[in-house]
Amino acid sequence: MPEPEGCRMSTFKIEKTGFLDRLFPERHWDELIGEKYKEVLQKISETTQLKDEVAGYIKNNRIRLGFHKQYKSGGGWTLLRNITLSPGDNPLSPYVLSLIVHETFHLKQTLWMRLSMQGELRAWQYQKYTYPEIARTKGNDIGSNGEAYAGTKEFWDELSKLSPDSRDDLEQAQGLMRKVSPGYRSGCLPLFPPGKEFVYFWRQREYAKAFGVLWKLITCK
């Protein structure tokens, strides 16, 4: 039985609102402000490398932090160049601090690089490389017992050895990321930035795959 016209309009409005919230979560997020925001930057600033590369970048570029429901991830970057975190998470925990480090690394990339496995692998590798500085027990690796992503250290170690410039390695990285975080949508991303992947398949006359790069990026869930 068809829905009344009013119901269809109501559903459309809900879907439109949901779509806009995914694009611009700042519309309805719980922003981290005041002393809590300063505490996060101070915590990240306790090491020289992260003070300059992350905390300084966040401060200088006026990057905002806010809590918003995530979809199969712990955090994310926004089109307005801000960072979202999962509601209820402690922003001062090593886990969340490492997410902020990860997403800040993304914000330094071009938009198209962020939308690729190449950009994703580089961010994961940076997250692993810098984690010991913010670990619960300083010096511990990410994924080790008692730390963020406990029990997944072997997968992080494998990810750290992969080349972001190798197509084979990027395909391997997709599987490893899902082992670290089941449900993670690494398979939605093209291996290289969308434009580069489109040209790659086009030149091989694999036209369906060329257009599929863009279609998958838009529709993948």
Give, region by region, the residue ranges found by the protein language model:
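Surface-exposed patches in mature extracellular/periplasmic domains of secreted proteins
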Residues: L50-N60, L111-G119, A135-A148
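Auxiliary, metal-adjacent structural segments of Zn-dependent hydrolase domains
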Residues: E3, S10, T17-L80
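Short pre-active-site segment immediately N-terminal to the catalytic Zn-binding motif
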Residues: N82-L99
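Active-site recognition of the HExxH zinc-binding catalytic motif
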Residues: S98-L111
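Post-HEXXH active-site segment of zinc metalloproteases
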Residues: P94-Y95, T110-E133
